[in-house]
Regions:
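Ankyrin-repeat boundary/"N-cap" motif
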Residues: 21-31, 52-65, 86-98, 121-133, ...
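Ankyrin repeat domain, specifically the short helix-to-loop turn at the C-terminus of the second helix
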Residues: 41-49, 75-84, 109-117, 144-153, ...
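Long, acidic/polar, low-complexity amphipathic helices and coiled-coil-like
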Residues: 107-201
């Protein structure tokens, strides 16, 4: 009994015991508070690891970027050991992917100057440019930068064979991005591996003005794809942040889809 008691006490006071404080630098709320360098340094001095990855492979730099901390703070974090510019984080993405996601072109340029690779593909099959497109980035300067640094707008496609114009289609609000990508050489009638064109992808976003615009441009919208799917099916997918309402399906039905 005495031996069992000693073992229990050893476990109770072990640094791995459940009562141990977690790394505050992995707490997203901490980065929402926009901490100062002094606050960050204090946390590090108190034993919080500035380069630790959580169970989903996000680290303090990721959270600082995603919570819109000043670039000077982010640069400071990147300067710390273990936070190399090409460090692999969630979904095999490096910091420049998260900068792209947050429309943070100055940070993207800084990371590039530090040696950030521009030709990586994440674990879901998205290049840097296509990650920007599939997350709805509308700032063409982001894409200009990617193209300037070697991205191939006509050949970079995701695992489904979708180009950046198709990927961004659910998020477009007018013809700006359509004109932008077609001016770079993408054919508005391009399709993915299953034969889905821009109308199907736009249906995910449910913007009737955009779909009308595409119809007026002469794109196909009633046809079935190679697996007998159509715009109605794509509308049911919605996007990560929104689902289509009944009005979208009534609109598509009125088109004969």
């Amino acid at each position: 009994n005495q031996l069992i008691y000693i073992i229990f006490l050893s476990f109770l006071f072990s640094k791995n015991y459940i009562g141990q404080e977690k790394n505050i630098l992995l707490n997203r709320d901490f980065w929402r508070s926009q901490p100062s360098i002094e606050k960050i340094d204090s946390c590090i001095i108190n034993g919080n690891d500035v380069s630790e990855l959580n169970e989903y492979a996000f680290d303090p730099v990721c959270w600082a970027i995603l919570e819109n901390n000043p670039n000077e703070i982010i640069k400071y974090l990147i300067s710390k050991e273990g936070n190399g510019v090409n460090k692999i984080t969630h979904d095999s993405r490096t910091y420049i992917f998260w900068a792209m996601y947050k429309d943070n072109l100055p940070l993207m340029k800084y990371l590039y100057e530090l040696g950030a690779k521009m030709d990586l593909v994440d674990s879901h099959g998205y290049s840097l440019m296509n990650f920007g497109a599939v997350t709805g980035q509308k700032n063409t300067a982001l894409y200009d930068f990617c193209i300037e640094k070697g991205s191939k707008v006509n050949t970079e496609k995701n695992n489904d064979g979708a180009n950046p114009l198709l990927l961004v289609a659910p998020f477009i609000e007018d013809e700006t991005l359509i004109n932008y990508f077609t001016s770079k050489g993408i054919d508005i009638n391009d399709v993915d591996n299953d034969g889905n064109g821009i109308f199907n992808y736009a249906a995910k976003g449910g913007n009737q003005n955009v779909m009308n615009l595409l119809i007026n441009k002469g794109v196909k919208y009633k046809n079935l794809n190679k697996i007998n799917g159509n715009a109605m099916i794509f509308a049911s997918y919605g996007t990560r942040s929104s689902k289509n309402k009944l009005s979208t399906y009534k609109y598509l039905d009125s088109l004969g889809i």
